[in-house]
Amino acid sequence: MSKVCQVTGKRPTTGNNVSHANNKTKRRFLPNLHHHRFWVESEQRFVRLRVSSKGMRIIDRKGIDQVLSDLRARGEKV
C-alpha cells in the first residue's frame, strides 16, 4: 500500500542524513499516516481512511461529509 494521505495527498519526500563529519546519505521523510475509522452519520456507517495528522485536523474542521464529497469528486472510491 502506498504511503499517501487520502485527504491531503501528502507522500514521502527525500532528503539527507547528515553526520557530524558532514557525510550525507539519502533518506526518506515519511508522512505521519494512520488508518482511522470515521463515523458518517448521513450514511450510518464507518469509513476507514488512511490519513495524516494534518488530514485528521482538516476532517475536524470541515466535517467528514464535506471531505468525503471532495474525495468522491476526485474519483477516489470510499
Curated annotation (Swiss-Prot):
Chain residue ranges for the region called Disordered: 1-22
Biological processes, Gene Ontology terms: translation
Keyword Ribosomal protein set for record: yes
Pfam families: Ribosomal_L28
Gene Ontology molecular functions: structural constituent of ribosome
Positions with biased composition (Polar residues): 11-22
Keyword presence, Transcription regulation: no
InterPro entries on file: Ribosomal_bL28 (IPR026569), Ribosomal_bL28/bL31-like_sf (IPR034704), Ribosomal_bL28_bact-type (IPR001383), Ribosomal_bL28_sf (IPR037147)
Keywords: Ribonucleoprotein, Ribosomal protein
One term under GO cellular component: cytosolic large ribosomal subunit
Family: Belongs to the bacterial ribosomal protein bL28 family.
Record PANTHER family: 39S RIBOSOMAL PROTEIN L28, MITOCHONDRIAL, LARGE RIBOSOMAL SUBUNIT PROTEIN BL28M
Name of the protein in question: Large ribosomal subunit protein bL28
Organism: Alkalilimnicola ehrlichii (strain ATCC BAA-1101 / DSM 17681 / MLHE-1)
Gene name, Swiss-Prot/TrEMBL: rpmB
